[in-house]
UniProtKB/Swiss-Prot annotation:
Protein name: CCR4-associated factor 4
Compositional bias (Basic and acidic residues): 242-254
Segments for region (Disordered): 242-262
Cellular compartments annotated: Mitochondrion outer membrane
Keyword Membrane recorded: yes
InterPro entries associated with the record: Caf4, G-protein_beta_WD-40_rep, WD40/YVTN_repeat-like_dom_sf, WD40_repeat_CS, WD40_repeat_dom_sf, WD40_rpt
Origin species: Saccharomyces cerevisiae (strain YJM789)
Topology class, membrane: Peripheral membrane protein
Region (Required for interaction with FIS1 and MDV1): 1-274
Length: 645
């Protein structure tokens, strides 16, 4: 064969290769459907062909190198051309594995997919040469043949009809294959959407975690600011060397001089004028409380859905040792104060870590009731069997609890977290409640005192009048703790009370609920229904909920004074709380009974695992408090459990 024949053969080879390089890769690579069913090595090779045409084959030398493109395509520095061709032509299943269940889907083969896609490529090549063709036109994957039904009805040529039938069947088959490809694409998109949803949930969890960390840092900022304000309030700022020097000098001082100074301080502590001054100064100090709590509550409410009880922590048995007699806390996860039977010291806890951060010594007997200010001041008011009420500065109690507190270096006076004593009752305090600037206390002496918190003075005295039938009722002991106040065989004379502005509700041992108007100092309504002493009550603008030793909880309509519902239990109700939607009840059982008034649903908190070791009597609930989705209950064995509802 001569050289002329060789050039002729090269010319015949170059023309199809030019078509492949100029037209076919563009059309094939533009099809997502083709990309999926052609293996990735071949797809990459087609891409390299385009790059080779544009870079390695400049316009000035195209004509002279077209005949050599077949050789250039398989030349490399790692293998000969034959080996390179076998590698490129090999379909590696590991590189493009079939999805699970692909065999069951009966997907078209690679060749069938190629045949169905060729028509699409041809149409797009034609549309590329048509002026004014839009992208929407190019998206029409398959154009159906124009079948002349009149010709079909009139022709008698079997050959023509056979060819037409083959053409139509081919198009039907191609449409079926394309439909299968599109449905598989839809399945893949659904899988991607599910994967994105899963990733979205993971991102949301990370956002919650970040938000929680941010909230903790913001709480730390608030804590630092409060600490700075505290140092400024009590003039505690001093350099480190001066503080150490002062401590060494005090250690050298004699016990006699220290005793003399302490004695003078004690006498000044009980001076009435100095106490009144300290109470006024207390309200002038900026007792900042963190109000940016909605974010943390939002996160917790997302993590723990409504009506699902989640156990958070336990302050272990042994911290109190005896039955919890009173507790209250500041939401969310702020300060918890608690007291136990025969323990005269109120303990202050940090609910973030479940550790004790302060103590309030001063009462001479068991503390029966307490309340933390929920608005502006970080203060606590307690009522005791020693017939006194005390107002405490919780910030100061935390400071004094520290071993290195500079306040302990002040020997010229005794510093105590007790800001004021309320001393008018003649018998033990069994219930108290305060709101805004008013404090109301009830005692076993059958008297209710209305106090002005700003001055510490008694505004008025309310006398309870009992009928002879109820004047000397003796109740048998039904549990270690009657609930909010007393331990013993006698029901509390005033078991519970709550005030709001000028409204006051009291529950007494005769089973009656009295509604008072503090502006006139007289009861304006009487609610009858309980058959035994009332141990707890709580009201809002529409409803009043009461718990009694008659084993029942009653829900009252304050507008009509009628009973809306009665919930019966097997044992006396020791304590309850109410926020307008949920009622939490301690009925001398191992768990807290929860009642959702809106949904009419009842459930009970489970017993924590550690509590299963004790006897039934020690595991009973003595007192419950519920605020903003947080439930805290105290047991007869001294344990305090924290829950989210």
């Amino acid at each position: 064969m001569g050289s002329g024949d060789t050039r002729g053969e090269s010319s015949l080879v170059a023309k199809p290769i030019e078509i492949i390089l100029n037209k076919l890769p563009h059309a094939i690579l533009a099809q997502q459907q083709f990309q999926k069913y052609i293996t990735s090595p071949i797809y990459r090779y087609l891409s390299k062909l385009l790059l080779f045409r544009e870079v390695a084959w400049p316009e000035s030398t195209k004509d002279t190198q077209k005949g050599q493109v077949g050789i250039f395509s398989f030349q490399n520095n790692y293998a000969d051309s034959a080996t390179t061709f076998r590698i490129l032509a090999h379909l590696d299943e590991q590189r493009y594995p079939l999805p699970n269940g692909a065999a069951e889907k009966n997907l078209p083969s690679l060749f069938e997919g190629f045949k169905a896609t060729v028509s699409i490529i041809q149409q797009r090549l034609l549309l590329d040469n048509v002026d004014g063709a839009t992208n929407s036109d190019k998206e029409k994957y398959v154009q159906l043949p124009d079948i002349n039904t009149g010709f079909v009805n009139k022709t008698y040529s079997r050959i023509d009809l056979t060819h037409l039938l083959e053409d139509v069947e081919t198009n039907v088959e191609n449409l079926s294959i394309n439909k299968t490809l599109e449905m598989d694409e839809l399945t893949r998109l659904d899988s991607m959407i599910n994967e994105l949803e899963s990733r979205k949930l993971k991102i949301l969890e990370r956002v919650k975690h970040i938000d929680s960390k941010s909230t903790n840092l913001e709480n730390d900022v608030t804590l630092i600011k409060d600490r700075i304000n505290f140092i400024e309030e009590y003039s505690l700022e001093a350099d480190r060397e001066q503080s150490l020097r002062k401590q060494m000098e005090e250690e050298r001082s004699s016990e006699a001089s220290s005793f003399t100074q302490n004695e003078e301080a004690i006498s000044s502590l009980y001076d009435v004028e100095s106490k009144d001054t300290r109470l006024k100064d207390f309200y002038k100090m900026p007792h900042e409380k963190s109000h940016d709590k909605n974010r943390q509550m939002h996160i917790i409410s997302e993590t723990y859905s409504r009506n699902s009880t989640a156990f958070r922590m336990t302050i272990p048995h042994g911290e109190h040792g005896n039955s919890i007699t009173a507790l209250d806390f500041d939401t969310p996860w702020g300060t918890l104060c608690s007291s136990s039977y025969q323990d005269r010291i109120v303990k202050v806890w940090d609910l973030n870590h479940g550790i004790q951060v302060g103590e309030l010594p001063g009462h001479l007997a068991t503390v029966n009731c307490m309340q933390i200010d929920k608005k502006n001041y970080n203060m606590l008011i307690t009522g005791s069997k020693d017939a006194t009420l005390k107002l405490w500065d919780l910030n100061l109690s935390r400071e004094l609890y520290l071993d290195h507190s500079p306040l302990k270096e002040k020997t010229e006076e005794i510093v105590t977290p007790c800001i004021h004593n309320f001393e008018l009752h003649k018998d033990e305090i069994t219930a108290l409640s305060f709101d805004s600037e008013a404090l109301v206390s009830g005692s076993r002496d059958k008297k209710i005192f209305h106090w002005d918190l700003t001055t510490g003075k008694c505004i008025q005295q309310l006398d309870l009048i009992f009928t002879p039938t109820h004047s000397d009722i003796k109740m048998p002991a039904r549990s270690l703790n009657n609930g909010t106040c007393l331990l013993g065989t006698e029901a509390p004379m005033i078991g519970a009370l709550q005030c709001y502005n000028s409204a006051l509700a009291t529950g007494t041992k005769d089973g009656l609920v009295r509604l008072w108007d503090l502006r006139v100092g007289k009861p304006v309504r009487l609610l009858e229904g309980h058959t035994d002493g009332i141990t707890s009550l709580k009201f809002d603008s529409e409803k009043l909920v009461t718990g009694s030793m008659d084993n029942s909880v009653r829900i009252w309509d304050l507008r009509t004074s009628s009973i809306l519902d009665v919930i019966a239990y097997d044992l006396p109700v020791s304590s309850l709380d109410f926020d307008g939607k949920l009622i939490t009840v301690g009925a001398n059982e191992g768990g807290v009974n929860v009642f959702n008034m809106e949904r009419d649903e009842h459930w009970m908190t489970p017993e924590p695992p550690h509590s299963l070791d004790g006897d039934e009597l020690s595991r009973r609930i003595a007192i419950v408090k519920y605020k903003d989705g947080f439930l805290i209950n105290g047991h007869n064995d001294g344990d305090i459990n924290v829950w989210t509802l």
